[in-house]
Amino acid sequence: VLKSIVNYEIMSTKVLILIYSKEIAMIINRNSELEKNMYAKLSQVDELISSNDVYALGLRLNALSSLCKALREDSAVKALTEALDKVIESGIIDSIDKNSLKHFMIGNAFYTASDFTGDDKYKNEAVKLAAGFKNFARNEAGYFKDADDKKCLCKAYSYEPFYMAYETKDGGKEQYNDVIGQYNAMNDELFADTKYSSDTTAKVKVLSVYAASLIDTMEVMDQMIYEIYRKMQDYFKASVKAVLETGRDYDDFDDFDEESELMFAYAVLKGCRMKALHTEKYEGIVLGVCDKVMAGEIFTDDDTDKNVVSKAALVYSETVRNREYQDYGRGKGGALWS
């Protein structure tokens, strides 16, 4: 049981110590130099905008958004708002194919910026973007049809978290049933084929992103609507278990491609913090990935892939936040997570 949290700074290192009743202290080092390097990498959005790399841009903004929520510092908010201002000024939102699901990826970053700054221009951008959900084309199974006509569980990450966030904040929750209905439809149609695919590398990549989509969607929903939350939790746990059933465990993450291991670690850490997974059972599986991110080389190596940088930042944010999850609900009306 968590007894206390001590937060202090020594030289350039911010240290968060959690003390448990069994007198075990877990220390998370937040190195200011590492975070400076991370912001420098993540703020490089100009090339993503000019190349119209919408998926990478959305992933980058998701990473900056996650860091704002985890660190709650002016430097994080500044990095996010500067990136979003470039997005707005570039006009890329208007030039994106509106039939492409990935153009919704940037939506939640606008909401985060609005929450931290109080500036309605970011909220207005989110609402304007969400208007595209109303008449978006659907496939025969009933979920949104992407511009390329390809079906993949991984595509939920492009739009479901933002769809849920919009409905929670500005849509009156009128389409909550559609959000879960789309998850139901794609899960029924695609999950089994993905889980039992002989292409282990491909299915791990898909399932890791799908798990991240589910846990991100759960985070932004009204927690009081338990039936929908529980259904998504079931899908989330099944996805995590399907990845582990490929034979991956503490010693086998070297078999993952780097993006998959990072996304899986992010999903597991977030699932533990939100009590969708049992921390004692699952957290230890991904701590090696956390150590790799905390070492900082990902954020200083000039050859690091742009999406690896973003996903590493997602892991960093949850590594910090996950240490506080057991203190959930205090001062927040009994919320399951914060």
Where do the protein language model's features map onto the residues?
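An acidic intrinsically disordered interaction segment
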Residues: M26-N31, S65-A76, K121-F133, E174-N187, ...
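CBM-like carbohydrate-recognition segments
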Residues: I27-G58, S65-V77, E82-S90, D94-L101, ...
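Short, Lys/Arg-enriched N-terminal segments with co-localized hydrophobic residues
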Residues: V1-A25
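Extended ligand-binding clefts on enzyme/binding-domain cores
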Residues: L153-Y157, P161-A265, L277, K281-G296
